[in-house]
Amino acid sequence: MTDPPRARWCESFLCRLRGLTFRPSLTRDEGLLLVFGRDSRVDSSIHMLGVKFDLAVFWINNNLQVVDKVVARAGKPAYMSKEPARYVLEVHASRIEDLAIGQTIHFQNA
């Protein structure tokens, strides 16, 4: 990503459950990083209930490698990664080409 988004760290169950639900919009420089205890397909699945806009979603494993990505549509109820992931990065839909499957990333505390 050339201009990385400022993603909010979201580790608690309630934070992950709520996600971006009921937000009116998301700017290109905002995001949410859902953090789970281990790599898992089931645990890292997401829902789009109450989300009013499309998202670029990246699933990232414990080795910080992107293992799947999708444009999540506001009208579809749920998405699951094809591979186990520990992190789910939700950002503006226009950023779907910012990361490639297989790419290794790093998190920066700002």
Spans of model-derived segments:
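Compact, glycine-rich, soluble single-domain proteins
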Residues: 1-110
